[in-house]
């Protein structure tokens, strides 16, 4: 149910974006390189032959992969694999701030998510960092509609795109009035989606904790207080 609601909310935002910024021209918009507007960093993978840097303990540092971005929804808060804190420090893995837009650009190009909390990623993911957080909803939609085929030949797009190309990709900056209006509509929608995702994640975690205990008889369903 939450998935359907979130899809509907996101579709409303994408529809407004399409109407205002894709189907409607405005000569006052400025085009620049992405790295002229954002501080773009790239993730990292410690040496795989040294397993001490990797973990499957959710208490360790979240380390996002493209696979995680394929299942997370609009916001991402967890990963299937983690890094130890020592790995982040020793190998200088970039820590991504909360509420930062992520973009996959290797093998699977164009997956997008927004961080819910601080985390790290592997080297196939770019981080669009900015102090101007009101641009995030616009950036998310911009990347959703961006034609990644323009960044390499159709047959080799999965391998042709690299961090240099991502940093140099064109970014269309909306006018202040356009951004203020779009942010005013989109931000509450994104906040609702985030709240729904958190609630769903909490219910899923509760289910995963209780179900094995119920199945084993360790817990009695009639004595559970929710």
Stretches with model-predicted labels:
Residues 32-174, 225:
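DNA target-recognition domains and sequence-specific DNA-contacting regions of bacterial/archaeal
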Residues 1-49, 63, 67, 172, ...:
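Non-catalytic DNA-recognition/assembly elements of restriction-modification systems
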């Amino acid at each position: 149910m939450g998935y359907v609601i979130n899809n509907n909310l996101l579709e409303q935002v994408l529809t407004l974006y399409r109407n205002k910024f894709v189907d409607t021209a405005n000569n006052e918009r400025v085009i620049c390189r992405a790295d002229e507007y954002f501080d773009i960093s790239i993730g990292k993978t410690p040496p795989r032959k040294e397993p001490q840097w990797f973990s499957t303990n959710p208490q360790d540092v979240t380390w996002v992969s493209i696979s995680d971005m394929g299942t997370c929804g609009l916001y991402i808060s967890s990963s299937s694999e983690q890094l130890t804190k020592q790995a982040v420090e020793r190998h200088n893995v970039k820590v991504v701030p909360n509420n930062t837009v992520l973009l996959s650009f290797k093998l699977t190009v164009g997956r997008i998510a927004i961080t819910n909390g601080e985390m790290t990623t592997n080297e196939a993911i770019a981080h669009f960092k900015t102090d101007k957080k009101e641009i995030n909803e616009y950036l998310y939609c911009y990347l959703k509609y961006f034609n990644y085929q323009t960044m390499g030949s159709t047959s080799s797009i999965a391998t042709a795109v690299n961090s240099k190309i991502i940093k140099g990709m064109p970014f269309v900056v909306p006018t202040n009035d356009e951004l203020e209006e779009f942010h005013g509509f989109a931000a509450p929608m994104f906040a609702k989606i985030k709240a729904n995702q958190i609630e769903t994640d909490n219910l899923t975690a509760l289910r995963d904790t209780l179900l094995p205990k119920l199945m084993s008889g360790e817990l009695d369903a009639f004595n559970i207080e929710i």
